[in-house]
């Protein structure tokens, strides 16, 4: 299998993830439970999309940095730092735009500092620098240490208590950044600072899988390696959840293992479908691949555009008008909400498809 084919299957998984992120982020009103995040302990399908993206980023880090032989040259480090800063800045821009569009253009008193792109930025920067300066044979031991340290923080610091006054994760964020710069819809900011510890372990597991994909010679060997790692992570996450429950809000160690395992298994299945049995594809499956490939090759651009577009359409009242039009046809609220979310996914697909046809791939 060529490098291009290998990346194609990864692009498909990235596209599935980004389309999923847009879908679950843009329901309207009352939604199906599976399209919403777990309130605290537990996990829904919605809770898979962000961790899948971090896992994919880990694989991409390895496949990207291997081109420079992991040499810590000035140009490579400069590119990592630049990308980290830009990702963080774009995340802040989205949060600022949500306030600015309602008139608070120069008011930063309530600007949320941490969100999805900010966490992606920190994890990308840390893991990329790790890849340049640390022996890769220590990747799994590093993951174990990070998860063990984070587990100790959760257990000793009341991390599973949904009360900001005692939860160590909430307290650190409150003391460092203040309540006005944090997420207000839960006791703990789901992208808070300490949660970055387990998120880095998450990306490192993806990095390790990227190493396996690169080092195995045949497609069959790559698939088997991913299946083994995926199965071990799922089993480990399940067993660990008895003492440390699955929890997306605090990015618990069991949640890391479970979601990384599921992502590895899905990547293995996609490699089977795309790289082993591609000759057996039908017109429908080819169209499906193209649909997700559109999202996969411009993942960052389409995620950012979807966030900005959702804010803009909400401000202009377009979102409400479209939803009301849908609701007149589809009476049940949950189904109307799903229909609106699907409409919004297709709207962003249209933007992505224009870029795709013109071979415009926006990268940082």
Spans of features found by a protein language model:
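Alpha-helical transmembrane segments and their immediate juxtamembrane cytosolic regions
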Residues: 1-364
């Amino acid at each position: 299998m060529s490098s291009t084919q290998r990346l194609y299957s990864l692009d498909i998984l990235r596209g599935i993830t980004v389309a999923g992120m847009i879908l679950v982020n843009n329901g309207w009103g009352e939604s199906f439970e599976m399209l919403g995040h777990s309130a605290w302990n537990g996990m829904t399908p919605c809770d898979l999309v962000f961790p899948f993206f971090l896992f994919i980023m880990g694989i991409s880090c390895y496949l990207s940095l291997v081109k420079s032989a992991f040499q810590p040259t000035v140009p490579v480090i400069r590119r990592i730092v630049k990308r980290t800063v830009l990702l963080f800045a774009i995340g802040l821009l989205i949060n600022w735009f949500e306030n600015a569009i309602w008139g608070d253009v120069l008011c930063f008193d309530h600007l949320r500092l941490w969100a999805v792109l900010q966490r992606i930025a920190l994890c990308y920067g840390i893991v990329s620098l790790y890849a340049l300066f640390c022996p890769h044979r220590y990747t799994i031991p590093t993951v174990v240490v990070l998860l063990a340290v984070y587990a100790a923080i959760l257990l000793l610091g009341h991390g599973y208590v949904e009360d900001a006054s005692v939860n160590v994760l909430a307290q650190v964020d409150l003391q460092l950044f203040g309540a006005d710069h944090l997420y207000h819809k839960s006791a703990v900011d789901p992208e808070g600072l300490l949660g970055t510890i387990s998120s880095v372990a998450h990306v490192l597991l993806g990095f390790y899988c990227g190493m396996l994909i690169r080092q195995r010679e045949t497609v069959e060997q790559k698939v088997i390696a991913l299946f083994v790692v995926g199965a071990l992570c799922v089993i480990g996450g399940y067993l660990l959840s008895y003492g440390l429950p699955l929890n997306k809000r605090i990015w618990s160690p069991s949640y890391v293992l479970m979601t990384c395992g599921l992502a590895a298994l899905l990547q293995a299945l996609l490699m089977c479908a795309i790289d082993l049995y591609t000759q057996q594809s039908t017109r429908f499956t080819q169209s499906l691949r193209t649909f997700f490939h559109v999202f996969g090759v411009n993942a960052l651009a389409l995620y950012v555009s979807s966030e900005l577009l959702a804010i803009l359409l909400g401000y202009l009242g377009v979102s409400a008008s479209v939803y009301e039009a849908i609701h007149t046809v589809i009476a049940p609220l949950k189904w109307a909400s799903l229909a609106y979310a699907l409409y919004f996914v297709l709207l962003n697909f249209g933007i992505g498809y224009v870029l795709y046809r013109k071979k415009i791939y926006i990268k940082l």
